[in-house]
């Protein structure tokens, strides 16, 4: 699975002795377009909402798209994720909808006895149970890992990450920092976006 991620933003915490970068609670809203051209068609939106309390991280993601395959045939896809993550576990509920037909997915990934075990239920099917490779990162931990490596000036690196939304399994991503000049500029019709203070990196994954 490969996709272009044009921008990765991280708030940076600075200690008196050294710079330490880590993920911070945040909300991000995206416009999804088909392709990188300046006139690429808009096909949907995505909202990423990450909060934290004493119980751990809470990640919500809401993705909605509509793609016109022909003049008379459109495909609408939606994915709504709600999840909780601690150092040792990731629990989530996911509703995926295609052309108005919903499918529920519930899952848990947890460290047990030195192993990382997944237990996932797709709709009414029996639970899928399997063991993930030891280096697998949970979603919020994966963001932290990317920030740490980029802040350490790593230009390119791999990472194993559990993906609850597309495949419900682990996949390998290759992260490469890009030249900032490669970022597509904002369109005149787009509303202005002001980034919060902090470090940012354009990357390809």
For each feature predicted by the language model, list its residue ranges.
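N-terminal secretory signal peptides that target proteins for export/translocation
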Residues: 1-3
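Bacterial N-terminal signal peptides
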Residues: 6-16
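Short, surface-exposed loop and linker segments with low hydrophobicity and enrichment for Pro/Ser/Thr
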Residues: 15-25, 51-53, 87, 184-205
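N-terminal cleavable signal peptides for secretion/export
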Residues: 19-74
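Residues at beta-strand starts and edge strands
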Residues: 24-28, 42-44, 55-59, 77-79, ...
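A generic short-segment signal for beta-strand/edge and adjacent turn/coil regions
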Residues: 28-33, 49-51, 62-63, 75-78, ...
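Hydrophobic/aromatic-rich structural module bridging two neighboring secondary-structure elements via a short loop
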Residues: 61-115
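Mature, soluble, non-transmembrane domains
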Residues: 93-205
């Amino acid at each position: 699975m490969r996709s272009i991620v044009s921008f990765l933003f991280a708030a940076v915490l600075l200690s008196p002795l050294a710079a330490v970068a880590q993920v911070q609670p945040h909300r991000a809203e995206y416009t999804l377009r088909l392709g990188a051209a300046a006139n690429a068609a808009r096909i949907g939106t995505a909202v990423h909402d990450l909060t934290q309390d004493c119980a751990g991280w809470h990640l919500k993601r809401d993705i909605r798209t509509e793609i016109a395959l022909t003049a008379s045939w459109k495909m609408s896809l939606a994915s709504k994720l709600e999840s909780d993550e601690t150092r040792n576990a990731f629990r989530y509920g996911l509703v995926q909808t295609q052309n108005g037909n919903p499918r529920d997915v519930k899952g848990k990934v947890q460290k047990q006895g030195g192993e990382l075990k997944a237990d996932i239920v797709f709709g009414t099917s029996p639970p899928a149970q399997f063991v993930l490779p030891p280096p697998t990162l949970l979603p919020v931990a994966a963001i932290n890992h990317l920030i740490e490596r980029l802040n350490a000036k790593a230009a390119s690196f791999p990472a194993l990450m559990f993906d609850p939304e597309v495949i419900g399994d682990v996949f390998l991503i290759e992260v490469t920092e890009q030249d900032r000049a490669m970022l597509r500029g904002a369109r005149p019709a787009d509303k202005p976006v002001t980034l919060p203070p902090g470090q940012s990196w354009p990357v390809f994954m």
